Structures are given as C-alpha cells and as structure tokens.
Amino acid sequence: MIWGLLFLLFLAVIFIGLNAFYKQTDYFKWQHLELESYKQGVPEQLDCGGFGSTYALYAFQAMPQYHSNNRFFNFSLNAESIEQDYLLFNKYKSHFNKGAFVLFTLAPCVCYYTYEESPQYNSYFLLSHKELPNFKLSRFIRFKFPLLYDFKQIFRSLKFLLNGQKQELSLDALFPQSVSEEVAKMNMKGMAEGWMHLFRLPNLREKNQDELNERVLKENADYLKSMIDDCIQHEMIPVIVITPLAKELTNYFGKAFLDNGMYKLIQDAVGTHQVRLLDYLYDADFQDNRSLFADGGFRLNVAGSSLLCKKIMKELLEN
C-alpha cells in the first residue's frame, strides 16, 4: 500500500515537473507571446497605457520609445474583449499617474465581442479567481496543467526545440514584414468572413439586426463608460483610439454598419464627457500602404506602429 502511494507521489512530482518544463519552452511561450511583458511586471507611475485587442497589441509596439523609464505599458492582448479591458483596467488603474493618458483602442467588430468568446487562458493567468467572472476550477486546472489534457504537447515542444532555431520572442517575428497584394486580399477576405460568421452577420455594410449583438453592444458601451468615468474620477485622461486599417479590409465596411455599431458604442460610452477621439480608421497614410501591415491590412508591423505612435503622441502633446 505505502509503496503504491509513494509510486503515485513520484508520478505526480514527475508530471508537475514536466508541466513546469513545458511552460518554459519557446513552443509554449510563442502561443502566449503577449503575456511576456506582463511576466516582467507592470510598472508603476505610468504616464500612458493602451488597452485593446489584437490590433492594439501590434499598433503600440513602438510606443515605449516615446516614454522613458517604463512609463508606458501595453495592456492589449490577442482577441481581447472590452470586458477583459475593463477587468484589467480595474486591476492596474492604480499604476497610472494623475494626468496619465489611458488609450482605449477600438476596431469595428470588437463592439460585438464578449468575454466568453475570448481566449480564457490570458484572463486566468493575469487575474485572481475573485477577479474573474464565472470562475471555473476545471478550467483553472486545465490552464495550470496543460499536459493533463494533451500530453502530446510535450513532444511537440521537444520537436520545436530540436528543429527550430533560437529566435527572439517578438510580435513582429510572427509575421513577414509585409505581404503581396494577392495575399493581403486573401487575408482580409478571411478576416471579414470570420467576423461575419462569429457575429452572425450577413455582411459588414448594413446595420446589425441581431438581437444578441445589440445586447452585447450595450454591455460593452457600459464597460467603456465605466472605465471613462473612472479615469475622470481619478484625474487620468481617457482617449479613444481607432487604429488604421488598409483598404483591403475597410472596403468591406459600410457607413450604416459602423455608425450603428462602433460609433454608437463610443457615443453611448462617452455621454456628456469631453473625451478625445483619435480616429485613424481611414487614415490616408495607411489606406493604400499595405507595407505598413504584417498581414496586409489589420496588424501593423513595426514601421506601421512607429508611424501611428508618432501621430498619436503628436495629437496628445499638442492638444
């Protein structure tokens, strides 16, 4: 009996050790690359910070060069919902100085996106169980011990280690510097069709008619409003930023869809407050220049990020 228990204990120790090893491999880190900055710690006394989804994660790559001594932090995550923005903002708002710029970054379809649809790993990694909506112990265990549900990952990580060359963990390394016109059109067509499928939309030109989308739109407006109110209460400066997209993607959008979706969300969230809106959606410098995008029209590369951040800081500091 005691030998059996000791053997089980030995297996448990081996399994925990393998999980710890796996989570330190580049194979695992590449899957959760946006968390690397969080692992280094969120600085105190921030003068500026950005919240948003994938588009913001890439858009703000160059922003630290405008803020010395770690005074900027990009809180954005891949496929992040506005509710996740809200949860992270509440956790880290004490890290901002008075007078700091808090950039809430939006794109046309994020207004219909919910927390439950977003990847849960990031939330479980960054937030405590008390801070998480609908915390589930089974989900926590799955994220804590990924090999428990897919042990083959340890072999994939070893294959990645043996076959791949050591590469610096960076967002820009995930994509080429730019893509051809043909690839850009294909990528953006896939993105537009993916949004239509995810949000049950016949197209991205007409006003949304889906009742669930309308409910989510109102909820997300409430989350954004709460963050704006909190900023003003704590003497921080909320700024809404709409990141640029190339024409390969904006050609899918119609005025009715945007006015009754993203822009309605902004209007409802801002209310009577005077909140600056920096709208680069159709910015001419980006519309016809897919070379500024890593995927042809959605994710900015380093050059695109540098240009956008320069524009943003010019607006913030001159007005």
What positions do the PLM features span?
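Hydrophobic membrane-insertion alpha-helices, especially the h-region
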Residues: I2-F21
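Histidine-centered active-site loop/cap adjacent to the catalytic His
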Residues: F293-N319
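Active-site segments of SGNH/GDSL-like serine hydrolases
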Residues: I228-K255
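Membrane-embedded segments
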Residues: Y55-R142
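Alpha-helical transmembrane signal-anchor/signal-peptide segments
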Residues: F21-G41
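Secreted/periplasmic serine-hydrolase-like ester/acetyl group-modifying domain
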Residues: P119-I237
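Short extracytoplasmic
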Residues: S37-M63
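Substrate-gating cap/lid alpha-helix
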Residues: K247-Y280
